[in-house]
Amino acid sequence: IEPFVTDRKLFRQRLISAVDYGKSLDGIDASKIAMIGFCFGGLASIELARSGHNLSGCVSFHGLLNQSDETFNKVNTKLLVLNGDLDPMVSSEQILALQNEMTESEADWQLINYGNTYHAFTNPLANDVAMGTVYNHDSDERSWIAMTNFLEEVFGNVNK
């Protein structure tokens, strides 16, 4: 993980390569691609949005929010960030920095900060308050609903 956290250019290149490969596969509608990530994958989802690469949407569940020192492109991808307010891996300064960054990038973004919720709140096996990783049933369900609503918005209702 560390090489990608410290070298965001490399990280974005790898993410873009993976998306471009996925777009090239038979049966894939390249105009309807979203990325969903949890923890480090949540950071990856945010980083892909920051890259300026065109996706329908990116979703981050309890993702790391640490920002790199690099300047980012205009964010063209809708972004949903789902965070626990007691997550020890995300500071209030990081939340504010992300909000400012996304607003300055003219992004279409949402951030939901679930109260009394730690990191890894979607993982039923997480139960370590000392590490700050605790499953939260209500936040898990609410975040899943938020994600499905977001995906319905970016893709349209596929069940109609």
Predicted region positions:
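N-terminal cap/leader regions of alpha/beta-hydrolase-fold enzymes
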Residues: 1-160
